[in-house]
Amino acid sequence: MHILDTVDAASLRTDVPQFRAGDTLKVHVNIIEGKNSRVQVFQGFVLGRQGDGIRETFTVRKVSFGVGVERTFPVHSPIIDKIEVVTKGDVRRAKLYYMRALRGKAAKIKEKRDFSTAK
């Protein structure tokens, strides 16, 4: 297993920011259509993270024109250009699957307040 660990370590990304369930992210994804390639931004909140190491994935959910859209990304995928954390969410669960059934104001995630800078 040590050989597999070294191969996996070579493929790990180092530019992944710290984020967890409830955080709002902008995921910049490279889309290749024929010979053209472009960057598409997928913005939504993180439902949860799964796995560990090279196999780690995270699921992002957004509501587009009244329809919920979820997309699962591998954290260390080469098609991800960059990941930006827009806001930190204040939630008490690691997986937010219950958010799929909520609508309107009930589906809002409270923003985490930072008390370390205030004196």
From Swiss-Prot:
The keyword Nucleotide-binding does not apply. The lineage of its organism: Bacteria, Bacillati, Actinomycetota, Actinomycetes, Micrococcales. It holds the Pfam family Ribosomal_L19. This is Large ribosomal subunit protein bL19. GO terms for molecular function: structural constituent of ribosome. It comes from Arthrobacter sp. (strain FB24). It comes from the Bacteria. The gene is rplS. InterPro entries: Ribosomal_bL19, Ribosomal_bL19_CS, Ribosomal_bL19_sf, Translation_prot_SH3-like_sf. One of its GO terms (biological process) is translation. GO terms for cellular component: cytosolic large ribosomal subunit. Keywords: Ribonucleoprotein, Ribosomal protein. SUPFAM superfamilies: Translation proteins SH3-like domain.
